[in-house]
């Protein structure tokens, strides 16, 4: 074989290997997606209504329903594991869980240690008013926020006074909440945007085939998310 033919042969071999490599991407180093087809999906649950809701029986919540449907598409069933956020994400980091859900967003510092899907739902927060009300300036105004909602900090940063309530739907004054909830309450959303969160689901580090499959599933649900959240709140 002369030098020209040798170079051509090497080039053809390299291209063939490149094509073969691309055909098998993305990969799961720990073969998580392949394993899930043969066993229950180990799902870490972090309580965070309406995303994950603890009940006396089967767990409920928007992300619980999403993962239940995703598992069904893969021909398996979820195996639920309750715990705190750090505990669950540490287990995920060491491949003891396959997925962790709990209203996580892309602001989590755990992105250095575990994998995440692409953001699948953007949750925007505004100040809103009951029908017929008007608000010129939020500064100095009392604004109701449900207890435990971190958006209260954003309200205070605007110079408003936060009133913490159990249920914002019973308030007859300015309210700060997610847009999907304000719409459900039939409140009028003002131009006072407070925050915007991108929701994600956590997976083990490096398991790219699993992330791709889950991303594809979540993409098909993107237009349903607002309605799913409103339905979950209506069940309370």
Task: Set out the residue ranges of the language-model regions.
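Short, polar loop motifs at secondary-structure junctions
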Residues: 103-105, 130-133, 146-152, 178-182
């Amino acid at each position: 074989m002369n030098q020209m033919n040798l170079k051509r042969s090497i080039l053809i071999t390299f291209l063939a290997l490149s094509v073969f490599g691309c055909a098998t991407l993305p990969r799961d180093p720990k073969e998580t997606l392949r394993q899930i087809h043969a066993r229950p999906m180990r799902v870490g649950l972090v309580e965070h209504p309406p995303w994950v809701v603890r009940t006396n029986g089967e767990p409920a919540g928007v992300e619980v329903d999403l993962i239940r449907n995703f598992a069904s598409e893969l021909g398996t069933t979820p195996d639920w594991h309750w715990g705190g956020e750090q505990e669950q994400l540490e287990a995920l980091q060491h491949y003891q869980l396959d997925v962790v859900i709990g209203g996580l967003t892309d602001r989590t510092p755990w992105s250095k240690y575990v994998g995440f899907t692409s953001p699948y739902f953007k949750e925007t927060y505004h100040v809103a008013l009951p029908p017929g009300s008007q608000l010129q300036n939020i500064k100095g105004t009392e604004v109701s926020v449900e207890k435990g909602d971190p958006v209260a900090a954003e309200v205070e940063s605007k110079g408003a006074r936060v009133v913490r309530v159990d249920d914002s739907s019973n308030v007859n004054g300015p309210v700060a909440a997610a847009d999907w909830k304000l719409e459900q309450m039939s409140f009028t959303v003002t131009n006072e945007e407070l925050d915007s969160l991108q929701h994600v689901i956590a997976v083990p580090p490096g398991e790219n085939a699993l992330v791709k499959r889950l991303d594809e599933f979540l993409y098909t649900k993107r237009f349903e998310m607002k309605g799913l959240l409103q339905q979950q709140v209506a069940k309370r």
